[in-house]
């Protein structure tokens, strides 16, 4: 996997899933692996954000993985809980 970083908020959300819901954590990890392999194509219905820089993918009906894919191939996770800044 290329370089992966988490914004502070996203890391706290990731730790929440690690403690509370392993099924959701597994889905997040699967999405991150797919982003590494396929960029902005693949599973989770990748969608370019309209009002800010970045992309989102569906974790489930309620939660979204929001991230930025950098030119150097690195990924920064901005959010992994809620539905866009909820």
Locations of regions flagged by a protein language model:
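A short, surface-exposed loop/turn module that caps and links secondary-structure elements
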Residues: 33-59
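PIN-domain endoribonuclease scaffold, especially VapC-family toxins
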Residues: 25-33
């Amino acid at each position: 996997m290329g370089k992966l970083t988490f914004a502070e908020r996203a890391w706290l959300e990731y730790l929440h899933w690690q403690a509370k819901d392993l099924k959701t954590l597994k889905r997040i990890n699967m999405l991150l692996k797919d982003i590494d392999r396929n960029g902005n194509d693949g599973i989770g219905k990748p969608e370019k954000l309209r009002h800010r820089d970045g992309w989102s993918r569906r974790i489930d009906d309620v939660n979204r993985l929001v991230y930025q894919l950098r030119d150097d191939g690195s990924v920064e996770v901005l959010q992994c809980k809620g539905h866009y800044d909820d």
